[in-house]
Amino acid sequence: MSLFGSTSGFGTGGTSMFGSTTTDNHNPMKDIEVTSSPDDSIGCLSFSPPTLPGNFLIAGSWANDVRCWEVQDSGQTIPKAQQMHTGPVLDVCWSDDGSKVFTASCDKTAKMWDLNSNQAIQIAQHDAPVKTIHWIKAPNYSCVMTGSWDKTLKFWDTRSSNPMMVLQLPERCYCADVIYPMAVVATAERGLIVYQLENQPSEFRRIESPLKHQHRCVAIFKDKQNKPTGFALGSIEGRVAIHYINPPNPAKDNFTFKCHRSNGTNTSAPQDIYAVNGIAFHPVHGTLATVGSDGRFSFWDKDARTKLKTSEQLDQPIAACCFNHNGNIFAYASSYDWSKGHEFYNPQKKNYIFLRNAAEELKPRNKK
């Protein structure tokens, strides 16, 4: 029996194979196009964990829906299932065993989607839109962490309608990440808080933001022992900060770099600066991808402090990205991110999710 029971696809499921895509300015990198992409802006992407055989991709959109595809080794994508919220879906994540997907929405709720039964139930409630959602698997507890614009961080046992714990945030939650035993939350007004999750979640440290502009995305990275050791933080000002929690030499080890900017130098020619919409670390190499409102993705080696690759420019922003569990596939979503306001929104423009073979391009150059 398949994970999703009988065929429960959505839309018209055409196929899209490696190497068979047509190229134009919506897909200048000749990457694989995911079939039946959402009908409105795509806000979040997440691949299934390694506990699940195969690769499944989840996307949440401003059409209030969450979609799931199976990604086959050939590159073919098969629509599997779909669930709805009553507001835009801002974040998605998986349970560690791959049996559940958790979704956060502007409708002020979070849901748990059981992929075997294809049933979704509400598991969380906030007083404002829920911006982030993460599954926490600790030795002594499991829970879902939700961050909201109501300035709270809540932790939920999925069997109870009341939160296990509520932590107050200094401002609205804008982005967050979790790799046990660490969580990091970035808020409005450039707030930045690290939490430790052992035994029970608690605030570990508040950090003065290394960035001067609004926080947009954050991703935790690991050290060589596979332990979370720091995070990358992106802002609307085309800049990423690499920040270690306990570095031997903070002034030397922590740094920021510019990205997602046009080629002007700011002195002789004005430079266009774009938001960093997403950051994802490669699960094997520890290198990272950034995507931006400029319609490009870039790959970086933070240890060598070098850029590995920048894509050609797509004809609309790249709103989200993620790697699959072994780092062979890089997924990125091309859709309007509202960075230029409603007057630049074109409802006729299609939204796309692309898949790229990432096995070689993310390797650090100094590795033999």
From Swiss-Prot:
Annotated GO molecular function terms are: RNA binding
Cystine links in this protein are: none
Q: Name one GO biological process term.
A: regulation of mitotic spindle organization
Q: Which keywords accompany this UniProt record? A: Cell cycle, Cell division, Cytoplasm, Cytoskeleton, Mitosis, Nucleus, Phosphoprotein, Repeat, Transport, WD repeat
Predominant subcellular localization, coarse grouping: cytoplasm
Identify the stretch(es) annotated as Disordered: 15-34
Which segments cross the bilayer? Answer: none
Where are WD repeat segments found?
Answer: 37-79, 84-114, 125-157, 168-206, 215-255, 271-301, 310-346
Which SMART domains would you find in this protein's record?
A: WD40
Q: Name one GO cellular component term.
A: nuclear envelope
> Is the keyword S-adenosyl-L-methionine in the record?
no
Modification type Phosphothreonine: residues: 229
Explain the purpose of this protein. Plays a role in mitotic bipolar spindle formation. Binds mRNA. May function in nucleocytoplasmic transport and in directly or indirectly attaching cytoplasmic mRNPs to the cytoskeleton.
Which PANTHER family does the record cross-reference, listed alphabetically? MRNA EXPORT FACTOR AND BUB3
Its assembly, as annotated, is: Interacts with NUMA1 (via N-terminal end of the coiled-coil domain); this interaction promotes spindle formation in mitosis. Interacts with NUP98. Interacts with MYCBP2. Interacts with USP11.
What's the name of the protein? Answer: mRNA export factor
| Organism, as annotated | Mus musculus
